[in-house]
Amino acid sequence: IFKWFKEWCNDEFSHGEAFALLMKTDPKLTSGINVYWIKFFLTAVYATMYVRDHQRPAFHKALGIDPSEYGQEVFAKTSELSRQIFPITLDIDNPRWIRNLKKMHQANLDLAEAENMTGLSAIVTRLGARLNAGLAFVSLMTIPAKSNTVPASTRLEPVY
């Protein structure tokens, strides 16, 4: 997939490099309370990617890609790159990680199903789905992060 979108990927990579340099200029950005914001940011980005990728099963089937396996591969590569900037990485190998991403995906399916409902059943389904998604996200946030010693110099390299 990255071969087909090479130019877009290179552009996104350049944005990441610029972001990394900005983060490196002020160590306060990656310490103290900001570590929690980093964890929130990474968790939100990864969870969003997982849910969105699972919304397109025909696309992934046409490419011959399993979106769950693909997601874990992208999470691993992204985590490796983020180690150069952030003092933590997410524990994507924790059993709760995939389990809660699947719960978020199911909550998203339930929300989509509620679009075809009316009345009280639609309200209850939407409320339940949002609650389930929120609880799954909180569970993802409570997975202990892995500490990381950020290297003095940053050398980001494209992984594809």
Q: Where does each model-flagged region fall?
A:
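Non-heme di-metal
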Residues: I1-Y160
